[in-house]
Amino acid sequence: MYKRQRLTFLGADHEVTGSCHYLQACGKNILVDCGMEQGNDVYENQELPIPAADVDYLLLTHAHIDHSGLIPLLYAKGFRGRIFTTNATKQLCDIMLRDSAHIQMFEAEWRNRKAERSATLKKFVPLYDMEDAQNVMRQFEGYDYGCIIEICDGINIRFTDAGHLLGSASIEVWVEENGVSKKFVFSGDIGNVNKPLIKDPAYIKDADIVVMESTYGDRSHGGTPDYVGELKQIFKRTFARGGNVVIPSFAVGRTQELLYFIRKIKEDNEKDNYLPEFDVYLSLIHI
């Protein structure tokens, strides 16, 4: 009996975090991303809406926690399927998922000390622990961009550089079932062009169904900003007042770009002495 392919949005449908899509095809249950919602309390409302043990495969677009952060929870709930991603994303997840577990365990210790002194606060239980984060990495398989991978009879996938983060990808999924072929494309997070450390995104030309992120879909970026020039002006104004510049930044991706721009400013400064000499300190959590 012919069964329709089904696509269900489990996360990031009315928000920009917690990305998770559920594709049912060829008798298989496939998740595309399994991200953690991020907001005032990132550990609330994170229950998985499907039985984890029923998931056969997980396709991962990139390592940011809002796309990968619930993978250890999926494992803790019984998922033992294969995880397909790029080589770089696999390596980053090995660091970032363990870091996520460490943060949760540290926060649990802090919250539970407070709960012991309160009649109203409940005991806090992490979504997953370090063992879950380490064990699920055994299910990761890393692949190069451009390779066509058969994940099962009737389903092939390919990763294409999305230009967002080291290892980030858009994923093409070809499904052939009951003599009918369809191509799904999951964009993942798409990067901008002319970035200093990451290649421009490679665009996919055809698809039957496209699932696309649209975080910045309502605005035009215009030309490439002069990040070095703008930072240089901020440094000059702040140093002239005897101040220090503090820059909050995402640990993976943005911090490395900032360090690149600051290095460029220091190199230029050796020639024109536009600024006084200054030191750069990086928070340990960003290393």
Where are these regions (language model features)?
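Short internal beta-strands
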Residues: R82-A88, F278-I285
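His/Asp/Glu-rich metal-coordinating catalytic cores
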Residues: R4-L59, S68, Y75-T255, R263-N273
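Conserved small/polar residues in nucleotide/adenosyl-binding loops
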Residues: M1-Q5, I285-I287
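Active-site recognition of the HExxH zinc-binding catalytic motif
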Residues: H62
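Phosphate-binding glycine-rich/basic clefts of nucleotide- and phosphate-handling proteins
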Residues: Y260
